[in-house]
Design a protein with these regions (language model features):
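Active-site beta->alpha loop and helix N-cap motifs at the rims of alpha/beta catalytic domains
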Residues: 29, 42-43, 48-165
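Generic N-terminal amphipathic, Lys/Arg-enriched alpha-helix
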Residues: 33-44, 296
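Alpha-helical structural signal in soluble globular domains
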Residues: 88, 92-96, 122, 126, ...
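Structural preference for beta-strand elements that scaffold enzyme active sites
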Residues: 34-36, 68, 103-105, 129-130, ...
Length: 326
């Protein structure tokens, strides 16, 4: 789809229903704090995005008690999505999320600044609770990254998360925020998160730092003042319970729940997105565990998701059922 076609598409999607959803959202701002799972992208057997299941996933996340939801990002396999799929998915999620409790954060990242700006303008029309952007594909130069993020921030005035990766420093993100007033949130996966949390807390309390990496160090992250974390969508109740217990002063119970969140980390690393989506199948949300191309996405050095692996994942999931709501 060329730029002119995309602009025409944006005009068509700014229909009365979407505009009405945007006005309603502007009147009911939701807090940007807590557990914000990254939504996974469901595909049909004929390799199309299953938008009905994407919406079903939003309802599922609402039932688990999460504070927010994010799409599309790395765990959404965003790079495999076509622009029209991202536009349509964003519209579907904005529409459904107005009746749900979690805040909605939409991803703006793209290979080029022009494309990212189109997504940002589309988001400005839709009015999600916030936006987020992974660094521009293949770009590591700080000046170029600044221009990319500034262009997104100029095109959409919603609260803005930067996804920090690679060599992006906390100091660089703070410097960017001086020119991007909406940039007050960061999901920091650029190296170990714990020192970054202390940096923001002690030197830039106006920032709201989130973490990722499936909350591997969630308990200490909360001790250091994390504003939230963005795990996958497979078992978000565990993270929600850990967060709520910790902030209710029930530290021992929170620590126990944090240990449960880490039990499945080897499964994600071994079976990759195929294992992640298979859990979504077991939870009754997804119809299959396919990725783009009509086949499961397993890491190059991972283990095939064979029948034995599926039996073992189900056995492990069964052990956690007492703590799962949805």
């Amino acid at each position: 789809m060329n730029l002119l076609d995309r602009r025409n598409f944006l005009t068509l999607t700014a229909a009365a229903g979407v505009a009405g959803a945007s006005r309603l959202r502007a009147q009911t701002a939701k807090p940007l704090r807590g557990i914000f799972p990254i939504m996974h992208t469901p595909f049909t057997e004929d390799d199309k995005v299953d938008f009905d299941v994407l919406v079903k996933q939003a309802h599922y996340l609402h039932r688990t008690g999460v504070h927010g939801m994010v799409w599309p990002q790395l765990a959404s396999e965003w790079a495999s999505l076509r622009s029209e799929e991202r536009f349509r998915g964003a519209e579907a999620l904005v529409k459904v999320s107005n009746g749900l409790s979690p805040a909605l954060v939409l991803g703006m990242q793209a290979p080029t600044i022009d494309e990212a700006v189109e997504y940002a303008r589309h988001a400005e029309r839709l009015g999600p609770d916030a936006i987020i952007a992974i660094p521009q594909t293949g770009v590591t130069d700080n000046h170029k990254l600044f221009e990319y993020y500034k262009a997104i921030g100029n095109a959409c005035k919603r609260p803005f998360f930067v996804q920090a990766l690679g060599g992006m420093t906390a100091e660089f993100i703070v410097e960017m925020s001086k020119a991007i007033p909406t940039l007050r949130y960061v999901k920091d996966e650029a190296g170990p998160p714990l020192p970054k949390l202390s940096f923001y807390r002690e030197r830039h309390p106006e920032f709201h730092p989130f973490t990722g990496n499936n909350g591997k160090t969630l308990y200490e992250e909360m001790l250091r003042g994390s504003a939230g974390t963005m795990p996958g969508s497979q078992m978000p109740e565990l993270y929600v319970e850990a967060w709520n217990l910790f902030h209710a002063g029930k530290r021992r119970q929170a620590a126990e729940m944090c240990m449960r969140t880490t039990w499945f980390l080897p499964v994600y690393e071994t079976y990759g997105m195929a294992g992640t989506k298979y859990i979504m199948v077991l939870r009754g949300v997804f119809k299959n565990y396919l990725s783009r191309g009509g086949k499961p996405n397993v890491p190059k050095n991972g283990t095939p998701l064979d029948e034995e692996a599926k039996r073992n994942i189900k056995e492990m999931l069964d052990q956690l059922k007492p703590w799962l709501r949805a």
